[in-house]
């Protein structure tokens, strides 16, 4: 329904934009005399768009949102035909409430069109809207269709660059700021691209990060520092440890930090501290089993998977919930054993999606692949392979003990304690020959054997399915004393 800007386009493009503002009626019949009842058929049975803040207090009503989408079509059709632009114009739009009156703000790329002609085009746009949208009835609203000028009273046409959106409009926080910019996802991608360009240039210059927290330009240092610390707390509370996750969650706060001096370094610093804070103060379970919506457990794919593999879902859920909560003592590992296609990897991947700090270890344990797993909340040991040389370290790791592994004479890495998921096609106890070693593994592992391949039409397990299942299991926990193998229902 909306055109988009190509995410690969340079954010600092030479494209310039004009800004049109269209005021809407508070009372349609009173402020647009002569409007027919048929006119409102355009607005019936229209689904609510999936935009941000649509249901917040003060958001534009659906009638105005629908009117905006139709007016945008009329304006762009005129613009692309009458101005003879070589390609369809790039644009951004936003509907909002200003002082109780609905409003539409539209940025349209000039694409070489002389600014001196904008007044003429705006007059013609008014006429086209009256004819093609308002069915020939002119709104009785002062200055209902205007374009931005350099002065409040008069002046030339004000021209904007695309950076005006994130660096000015998105910085405004007000109750009526609703229905954020229509191409917000693409804008986030473009902002991410600038960020990557900035980070290269700034790291080449090796800036002094202290300038960002304690600027010399008169900025309130204490206020800026407290805001930065508040941002770190917000990131860690939500489990945000990557730039992509930050942009998806709140592009506005990301851009606010990016626009500061050396903001890209600040972003990296905030994410780095957020990771350390999460690792020091949170458990994996803190990011799971928080559900505020109703659901039917029998339709949950995790519940269905355990039933398919002949496990008691309550027992399985109890084990997983308490294991993620560090409440099973030395039993720090769950193993999902089974052939390809049995659902073990799909289940594990969905668990990890909920947890911001996680690692995946492939195959055997060695010094080359340890450094990346020093600060994780959950470790997935995929296709686990146990060798005799490192068995004591493996035993400690599976048992939830902190281990310090030497990398070289001057360096080491600390791993754990963190819950571990081990997946394999064979029972991990078959990888060792000593009965002592088998006993050690039995004391540290809950073993789920998946012996059935899931059907092709089996639903894909999503991260929310894990949340629902563990939330359900948390309220039905049972006492369980299991040596190694989780029993199946006969």
Curated annotation (Swiss-Prot):
One of its GO terms (molecular function) is ATP binding. SUPFAM superfamilies: Origin of replication-binding domain, RBD-like (SSF55464), P-loop containing nucleoside triphosphate hydrolases (SSF52540). Keywords: ATP-binding, DNA replication, DNA-binding, Host nucleus, Nucleotide-binding. It is found in: Host nucleus. It comes from the Viruses. The keyword Signal does not apply. GO terms for biological process: DNA replication; viral genome replication. Signal peptide: none annotated. Coiled coil: none annotated. Residues 312-463 form the SF3 helicase domain. Residues 1-210 form the PV NS1-Nuc domain. It holds the Pfam family Rep_N. GO terms for cellular component: host cell nucleus. This is Protein U94.
